[in-house]
Amino acid sequence: MSLPYPFSALVGQDEMKRAILIAAVEPAIGGLLVLGDRGTGKSTAVRGLAALLPKMRAVQGCRYHCDPQASGGCDDCLHLKSGVRVRTEELPVPVVDLPLGASEDRVLGALDLERALVDGVKVFEPGLLAKAHRGFLYIDEVNLLEDHLVDLLIDVAASGENLIEREGLSLRHPARFVLIGSGNPEEGELRPQLQDRFGLSVEVRTPSAIADRVEVVRRRDAYERDPSEIGRA
């Protein structure tokens, strides 16, 4: 797996970088919306964030990486409320991409059809919302997201839980994450209901200084040749 472009190697865009760090330090701020021209490093900055985050402590083997010190976890971790000691592990804070073409099953999770057909058991296969729990859910071109997915995100972001009632399944699991969206306003408007879910917003522009543009190309070329080297530069 290739290394993401380093967050610190981005040229300029100080307001965007500061906003991303604020959202990372204080998740209660309510998410971040980054709007601006294409090619301004919006996606690169968000994906580079993962390397800056400290690891988190989670219940070992939990599919939703529940916090062993917090209540309100998944059904499998309800015993934590009784004070029972459990094994834990350190995991990277998840930074999960939600692509525009993602199906509802992929986002919410769905019945594992292979297990159902082969073993005759109903097993829930967690979706992107589960993977993003306690981390970040990133949507590039969020202004182009399909309406039905927007409605789902609004519900989950408000409740902090994902409720599944389909295909004979009825369950809920925690889904608390920092929502980060980016997009170009010229390509489509963002629904007001979703825009209200972002507590912080920032606009970015293509660098106008020739020196900055040259430096962007130089650093990108260095990254393409040796991703690990630019991270140490």
Q: Which role does the model predict for each range below?
A:
Residues 233:
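Conserved small/polar residues in nucleotide/adenosyl-binding loops
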Residues 114, 215-230:
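Conserved AAA+ ATPase "sensor/coupling" helix adjacent to the nucleotide-binding pocket
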Residues 174, 212-215:
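Short, charged, surface-exposed secondary-structure boundary motifs
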Residues 1-203, 208:
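Conserved ASCE/P-loop NTPase catalytic core
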